[in-house]
Amino acid sequence: MTVQLGAFYLFPLFMAGFVQTNSNLEKMDCYKDVTGTIYDYDAFTLNGNEHIQFKQYAGKHVLFVNVATYCGLTAQYPELNTLQEELKPFGLVVLGFPCNQFGKQEPGENSEILLGLKYVRPGGGYVPNFQLFEKGDVNGEKEQKVFTFLKHSCPHPSELIGSIGYISWEPIRVHDIRWNFEKFLVGPDGVPVMRWVHETPISTVKSDILAYLKQFKTE
Amino acid sequence: MTVQLGAFYLFPLFMAGFVQTNSNLEKMDCYKDVTGTIYDYDAFTLNGNEHIQFKQYAGKHVLFVNVATYCGLTAQYPELNTLQEELKPFGLVVLGFPCNQFGKQEPGENSEILLGLKYVRPGGGYVPNFQLFEKGDVNGEKEQKVFTFLKHSCPHPSELIGSIGYISWEPIRVHDIRWNFEKFLVGPDGVPVMRWVHETPISTVKSDILAYLKQFKTE
Amino acid sequence: MTVQLGAFYLFPLFMAGFVQTNSNLEKMDCYKDVTGTIYDYDAFTLNGNEHIQFKQYAGKHVLFVNVATYCGLTAQYPELNTLQEELKPFGLVVLGFPCNQFGKQEPGENSEILLGLKYVRPGGGYVPNFQLFEKGDVNGEKEQKVFTFLKHSCPHPSELIGSIGYISWEPIRVHDIRWNFEKFLVGPDGVPVMRWVHETPISTVKSDILAYLKQFKTE
Amino acid sequence: MTVQLGAFYLFPLFMAGFVQTNSNLEKMDCYKDVTGTIYDYDAFTLNGNEHIQFKQYAGKHVLFVNVATYCGLTAQYPELNTLQEELKPFGLVVLGFPCNQFGKQEPGENSEILLGLKYVRPGGGYVPNFQLFEKGDVNGEKEQKVFTFLKHSCPHPSELIGSIGYISWEPIRVHDIRWNFEKFLVGPDGVPVMRWVHETPISTVKSDILAYLKQFKTE
């Protein structure tokens, strides 16, 4: 099932000034020879009620984000809401994965995470408009399998991996996620397309996605 | 100025079944030859507005507690409210010191801590009825001076200090605080009287304080 | 079986100028209520050929030392030789336990340790004139049982335990050995008598032992 | 000054059975667009007497190796002697850099390293027939500049970087050297040509160098 994008939807957004095209240094195109798709993997929703097979997102453009409540980048959460809203018509689905491996900035239980987002940080009643999954590892021995697949389908994000004081997983690998709020875009066929470092502004992520959608449209 | 305790106030509480006397192993009587008092020290209130000199608590029985929002013992917070309420008439003042050194379970900024307590953990609208101070260290090179004084005025709480994965201070010392929610009782003369390990139930802390107040009264 | 000490042997040594009596701060008298003896424990000799039951030292005054080749204190090795030689007539037996837990300064295999001492540090053909045992842990989960017994039979040596960069055992305990070359003296009944911090000069250890032997003699 | 290689010297070695060509997975060809050469860097010899500018090796094929005495791979030392001897006629110069960053397996002082090699490991009177330099870092904030240049001139050697227990440098980077005995071959123009992981047998390193020399000869 492929997503039909009306070019005329894309163009206004592309030009609407929401989009600052940063250098591609931050965007990494994933490898061309990836075998397998995200459809081989699954996860429990944050409230533990639903076991979601990622193949349910076949045909969608899925943005995987490892998130945390008490991070200096937690302000990206509301921006992800905006991104989800704006690009939903184009088949974008944002998925959030709380993780406590980066400076232990997601200390809450699954049942506490939405409360923390709503009342503490970003606070002000914030509620994600995209699916969050159960807290889990994205690096190291107990990393969630979908993140093993995503990480090794794309170039590593930076020469710097981190400092021992903030690394709480074993072993340390080149393709490890560097910090909260790294992002992977997966195409409608379940194959990873792009990866962004955590500091990449959402606006850049958005413009990269729009450019990709446009190109996807013409192809 | 010494606190006049009506023995008849103490006795009912002592017997009222709220009190389970645990073995004294958990309570440690501080050293008799302590020099100096807490009145030499000070701290900023959690909101940063007030610089409090601890000598303002002269004549009070002050309970110092290092606290954290996302700790397995955070349920002690409401119990500390009850303790403060019940023993306020006897001159007890509870003081809370948020600290992120134990498993990094206090990741929030000062401005976020009360929100986390109110809405996330313990949540349910909880508001401490005692003073909280600015987040700070209680162990290691940058430990708050009052905690240096408190720790070295009393025996260390346990043979086990901890595991490297959860110790995020330097250097490691015998008298270091072991985890969130350790407690020190300071007498009305500013001299430390008792120290409890973090796991000590508040009910035991209460009965120890009542026994101490009773003895203090008769002396 | 008690060691008969000729007082006249002790006195000249005591006065011979080899002995500088340092403050007792460095010496710690072990606890009086110790149960058990070193005779419950054993170890393999460095070359692995012999399994030594410590009860074979019944009647002797045994000095346990955790040693390392590449330590700033390795110069104590030749001084331990001198100590063994001088106090052998009085029943002193020095036992060395190579250990790699302090800054990883004993990296060699058992078969390499004597070579390292002889040719590298202290070098110059040095050969210990006392028994060395197989390399093993003295702190943490896999610590040798005799060191668990020794450590908990005596006060801990210092408030400072160490810095995380140099601590490679789990968990961290108050009575842990602080560095290479700590020493425990055990009486002829197998019960620990004294403990010294690593920096204590051997001359001080010697004078403390002589004073103890003298007292032991009169008692 | 370029090295004239008599093809007839290369061919017999290439075929002489000393050479097992392993998969190139272990060999990494350095980047083509490297700017700068090793000639911009220098180091002090192990005994501290000589300050060597690497430009003195212009025209030579230089093999940089970070070494350690108490490593499971220290047996590569005698093999490096053989390599130096066999390929000296073809302009190969082996340079060894003792480093204590991998499991702290080079604890000795500069003055002790040759003693350790000669009498302990590999022992048996072993003396390197190639230049050793002063002990120093090859990763992290204080890494020697020549290793910064070498590491970033070639692909990183493996996805696995290591486990926190054995990493004693900050920060951790993708191109960091993984363990003792990694190797870099630098051409006669001072530009890095090849990099090998630490486990690569010296025989493979040799056959890779011979193949390179042969190709270098024909070009």
UniProtKB/Swiss-Prot annotation, chains A, B, C, D:
Superkingdom, taxonomy of origin: Eukaryota
> Which family is annotated?
Belongs to the glutathione peroxidase family.
Pfam families given in the database record: GSHPx
Q: Classify the main location.
A: secreted
Q: Which tissues is this protein detected in according to the database?
A: Proximal caput epididymis.
What does the record list as coiled-coil region(s)?
none
The answer to whether the entry has keyword ATP-binding is no
Task: Report which gene this protein is encoded by.
Answer: GPX5
Q: Which reaction(s) are listed as its catalytic activity? A: 2 glutathione + H2O2 = glutathione disulfide + 2 H2O
GO MF, one annotated term: glutathione peroxidase activity
Q: Please name the catalytic residues of this protein.
A: C71
What is the name listed in the Swiss-Prot or TrEMBL entry for this protein?
Answer: Epididymal secretory glutathione peroxidase
Enzyme class of the recorded protein, top EC level: oxidoreductase
Name the GO terms of the biological process aspect: response to oxidative stress
Location in the cell reads: Secreted
Q: Does the keyword Kinase apply?
A: no
InterPro entries registered for this protein in UniProt? Glutathione_peroxidase, GPX_AS, GPX_CS, Thioredoxin-like_sf
Oligomeric and partner information = Homotetramer.
User: EC no.?
Assistant: 1.11.1.9
Source organism:
Sus scrofa
The signal peptide, as residue positions, is 1-21
Q: Name one GO cellular component term.
A: extracellular region
Primary role: May constitute a glutathione peroxidase-like protective system against peroxide damage in sperm membrane lipids. Since the purified porcine enzyme has very little activity towards hydrogen peroxide or organic hydroperoxides the protective effect is not likely to be exerted by its enzymatic activity. Instead, may protect sperm from premature acrosome reaction in the epididymis by binding to lipid peroxides, which might otherwise interact with phospholipase A2 and induce the acrosome reaction.
Q: Which terms are listed as keywords in the entry? A: Oxidoreductase, Peroxidase, Secreted, Signal
